[in-house]
């Protein structure tokens, strides 16, 4: 474990408008792909390209358990805690669970295995009661699993026409789920009936013809106002008051909808110089609907936005340009040293962001 004060380290590539302390959680032997925080215990889990999972103690920032078998030599793409002692992990199209009460430091045997998805799983998500586990995949489908009965209860299919990038349950609702897709849409479901309650489709942009991936990446970095990606939806997250869903898109835009009406609450034409990889409501805030975290795909910039009603009133009544309005909304920003895979927060650790990037080390960013 090493700590760095980003603002005072001349050899670090990070830039920030706040004092950020970076702590490295060292243990994985390859790129960290995913992270999950426990809602009741001061632990987090991380999955890696090294085909293992590690459990970390937030008090010491050290690994206390590792799962080294059960993934058939595959990278672990998703991890998700239940409310007690079980960790669910996915690799390829398979989900396996592990009982963390085992006294062993190294775990090798899983408890349950689910093979309901047909293609690679992109996100795992629990409902508020931790009865239903959602798993969305590359086929565009989302499987709903009742983990108390170990059975598939519903398949949400034939509505998304491309990769399903995200799935999140509406907090404290009985049967509501929101999914996102590369088909430029998000869907609000009654997941127990496989019924579409709302759908929002974002206008498809146009891509230049005959452009290579490297050219696209370079142009995203050097020409922030010329987005080459269409607005495919890359992620979704719900606020803890159950009122809002935040949406990140490939054209660098953030949209927040009111869930009940599915009408647009606000739109941010982002300062990110690339597509936005993820949006996340910080779990450490009691009223987290007032703040939103985002990061870009290639620009490596992490931004904490003020999306409160007071700020909306302020910027909507001003004569500022879009860029100036964005600057008004920004509470904290930093440029990370590596391309980021994902991030999360914990309701048990204030002002802290956990970042999985292309390095082997999990990063804890403490905002001072």
Swiss-Prot record:
Keywords: Repeat, WD repeat. WD repeats lie at residues 27-66, 71-108, 116-155, 159-199, 228-267, 271-315. Residues 207-231 are annotated as: Disordered. Belongs to the WD repeat WDR53 family. The keyword Methyltransferase does not apply. It holds the Pfam family WD40. The gene is wdr53. The lineage of its organism: Eukaryota, Amoebozoa, Evosea, Eumycetozoa, Dictyostelia. InterPro entries: WD40/YVTN_repeat-like_dom_sf, WD40_repeat_CS, WD40_repeat_dom_sf, WD40_rpt, WDR53. This is WD repeat-containing protein 53 homolog. Disulfide bonds: none annotated. SMART domains: WD40 (SM00320).
